[in-house]
Amino acid sequence: ADWSQYPLADVRAFSIDDSDTTEVDDAASVVHLEGGRTRVGIHIAAPALGILRDDPLDKVARARMSTVYAPGLKTTMLPDPWIKAFSLDEGRAVPCLSLYVTVDDETFSVEKTETRLERVSVTRNLRYDKIDSLVTEEAIQSGTLDVEFADEICWLWRFAKKLQKDREEVRGRPEPVGRVDWFFALEGEGEDALIRVKGRRRGAPLDLLVAELMIFANSTWGLWMEEHGTPGIYRSQRMGRVRMSTTPGPHDGLGVLRYAWSTSPLRR
């Protein structure tokens, strides 16, 4: 498809996923502005631009609802050719819905947001399993982090800490620390493949960075859709009960006024 009608963003974007991720939904960018401000870009793949309502592909995606992960098996929501066409793989300019956030460098407070439909060329697909052990709080705080996009990662981590602090004040309790999310990883192919159990530290710098940017995007777009009367799929939580609905509501567990499912369009 020809997406040349959409402007090409002037950013150096990068994504952070596992090495076996084929559906790269999101990426980020950082541009330092004059006057002590920084513009954060949260770039989300936009496969809906190439899918017509009620055509066969739309019906398949709606029937599957999400990508299914199982040990040794992954069934994707979208067919492989469509994933390859819209995945934010490095070196390709693909259509994105971008949320730009202007942030004060001193306080890390959000001054304004802007949403654009554009093309984004991802410079690098970074991988958790390659750099997660290197990206520590100690390395960030001491200025010794030595990975690609180190400056951007350090800045975004500090911004993410501010976003997390704001949410914790709303929800009235801190995020749990030290939790490990366990998952199955397939190494090799065919009958000789090995299934290994691996863990990811919740709250580790890279995990925190990605999680907070996605929560912020989903919260911002949820409020935006509500203001404009646009239908959406919302996740809310009141009195401990989590609901999925087309009616917006607060999410007490996350500490946000609205939370729309917007940031994983290739997978759900």
Predicted stretch roles:
Residues 1-268:
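Electropositive polyanion-binding surfaces
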